[in-house]
Amino acid sequence: KSSAASDVYKRQGLIDTFALSEEIHERFYHGYHDVKLPHKFKIAVGGCPNNCVKPDLNDLGIIGQRIPEVNTDVCKGCKKCAIEAACPNKVAKVVDRKIQIDKEACKHCGRCVGKCPFHTIEDGAYGYKIYIGGRWGKKVSMGKELGKIFTSKEEALDVIEKAILFFRDNGIKGERFAETIERIGFENVEKQLLEQL
């Protein structure tokens, strides 16, 4: 297990990485100690999209998120928009005198929340983005993100459990999770992990 423990104290930290990694450790390392997997299974937790501990380079990675809740009814379309200025990825733009956020490109860093003096983005749900199939070393594989941001910690933990059990049931001895996913197909694995959530 690894976590960006300092994210708890960093301004950008969106989730308590240490507490979550401890819960993951207790539930899955201790709780699943007798479960035999085809190979080691590494889990990393990062507190924000800055990606300090590279969760996407682990078998399963979690990255803290904050999904902005936009109220365009109060947007004044300011020429010097505080939300636009706060967005490090430049995906928030004033168009036709209303703020618009490119939802596909938004990294959910939460930096836009609370910046507007007219309260256009006053809040945002906290969540967890999950990557699967990453690895580092002789063979590098960038993990792929599941097509959902989980706003419930329990739901995110359930996905971890499903991933571990999927690897147990479908992995070949000596095979890393990235290879299992490649062999079976990311879309097939993703579908099974997201079923009944």
Where are these regions (language model features)?
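Short, well-ordered, mixed-charge alpha-helical segments that flank or form enzyme active sites
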Residues: 11-12, 49-55, 139-140
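Flexible, glycine/charged-enriched surface loops at secondary-structure junctions
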Residues: 34-40, 95, 169-183
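A gly/ser-rich beta-alpha-beta helix-loop segment of oxidoreductase catalytic cores
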Residues: 35-68, 186-188, 192-194
